[in-house]
């Protein structure tokens, strides 16, 4: 995909359908319960109606896509482990043995692991959307070329649209890639104009010394590459990862296809931020599942204007937080589609008092 082709696709993302949102709101108000009594469970279905264009919601087929990629910046000691762990987890994703696979089974959710750019040979059972065998070390120069960033975004768009064509009506996002909290912190710091120290956490449990190395690597990467905060693709290319760029595309693809996309934690939240910076109308497809324990996660969600369903200190990755929210969607849909109405119960409806 070329940048011109990407821009043409983005131009096709339309605003949310406010008539469908209003219809969903009216349906909630007709049900025999206190007005707005289910809080965010109600508004998220209204948002889903605005995205899909219909107050008749069917989200029964769902999938979590786990985008795997390696990051050259791990050479700077920003993580406890090396790139071999990315591959090991990808292999276990293919065998359906990881944490998210167990949670997905409980949530009746399919799992699609995707190689966006892991080091080494392809992993059997992992779908290949590979851009390259990992990114470069961004302390020495750009993590990837601009063309590669566009290609990765394009792969994510194509993936989401294909899943929609296959009948999936809810897409959860996940990722796996050693070093990707470093790339996410770097991208978020530049896009939001925030201090690197504020946007950088301990990832998978770094020591104080490890955290200092991580902050230093990000600062050096920004100094070396001078990314333009007004040019999202420039920031992605210079400081991001193939997983972030691919997830950015998944959010854009969801907006094009009218399919809700669940942001998992910090990393997919940064990807959603990139998507919305590329096309503000794409925000209609972004649904926050939880607020990660990563320090900057809340800042990213606030920038997106999204409130999480769950705040439970999760910071595992793989899409576990997104999948954990799916049963809440199921319960909301059960009430939305099955609860009796005021009219059916012979009860006078509530009326707004304020």
Annotate each PLM feature.
Residues 1-354:
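N-terminal loops that bind phosphate or other acidic moieties
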């Amino acid at each position: 995909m070329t940048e011109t082709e990407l821009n043409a696709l983005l131009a096709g993302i339309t605003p949310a359908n406010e008539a469908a949102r209003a219809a969903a709101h009216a349906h909630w108000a007709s049900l025999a319960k206190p007005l707005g009594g289910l809080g965010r469970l109600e508004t998220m279905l209204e948002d889903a109606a605005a995205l899909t264009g219909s107050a008749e919601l069917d989200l029964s087929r769902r999938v979590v896509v786990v985008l795997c990629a390696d990051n050259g910046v791990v050479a700077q000691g920003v993580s406890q482990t090396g790139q071999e762990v990315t591959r090991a987890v990808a292999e276990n994703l293919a065998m359906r043995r990881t944490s998210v696979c167990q949670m997905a089974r409980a949530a009746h959710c399919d799992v699609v692991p995707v190689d966006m750019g892991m080091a080494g040979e392809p992993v059997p059972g992992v779908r290949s959307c590979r851009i390259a065998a990992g990114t470069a070390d961004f302390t020495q120069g750009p993590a990837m070329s601009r063309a590669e960033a566009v290609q990765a975004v394009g792969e994510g768009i194509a993936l989401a649209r294909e899943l929609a064509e296959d009948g999936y009506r809810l897409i959860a996002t996940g990722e796996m890639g050693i070093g990707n909290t470093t790339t996410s912190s770097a991208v978020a710091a530049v896009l939001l104009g925030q201090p690197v120290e504020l946007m950088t956490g301990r990832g998978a449990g770094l020591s104080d010394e490890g955290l200092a190395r991580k902050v230093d690597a990000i600062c050096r990467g920004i100094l070396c590459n001078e990314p333009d905060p007004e040019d999202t693709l420039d920031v992605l290319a210079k400081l991001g990862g193939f997983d972030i760029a691919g997830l950015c595309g998944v959010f854009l693809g969801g907006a094009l296809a009218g399919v809700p996309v669940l942001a998992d934690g910090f990393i997919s939240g940064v990807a959603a931020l990139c998507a919305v910076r590329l096309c503000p109308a794409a925000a209609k497809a972004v649904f926050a599942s939880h607020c990660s324990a990563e320090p900057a996660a809340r800042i990213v969600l606030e920038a997106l204007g999204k409130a999480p369903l769950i705040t439970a200190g999760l910071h595992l990755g793989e899409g576990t937080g997104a999948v954990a929210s799916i049963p809440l969607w199921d319960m909301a849909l059960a009430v939305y589609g099955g609860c009796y109405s005021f009219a059916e119960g012979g009860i006078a409806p509530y009326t707004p008092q304020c």
